[in-house]
C-alpha cells in the first residue's frame, strides 16, 4: 500500500450530506486499515476542486457527469444505505488497484 488515497466528496451544497459521506468513508477506511484523506466540495465547483486537490477519485452524492480524467462514484448509497457495502467494496477495490492506501 502506498500513499493515502485522496477522495473528493461532493454534493449539491457541500454541507450535511458531504460531511456524512466523508465520515462514513473515513470510518470504513479505518475498519479496512486503508489510508485515505477526504476533501469536500460542491458539484458546481467540480473542475476547480479537482484541479486544486488532485484527488484520486470522487464520490458524489448529487448527480454529475462522468469525467474522462477521474473516476467518479455515486455516493447515494452512503446516504440511503441501500447498496452501501457494495459501494465500499468498489471504492476500496479501486484504491487497492491504484496502489494507494
Where are the model-predicted features located?
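Proline-aspartate-enriched helix->loop->beta-strand connector
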Residues: 54-55
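Conserved active-site segments centered on acidic
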Residues: 2-43
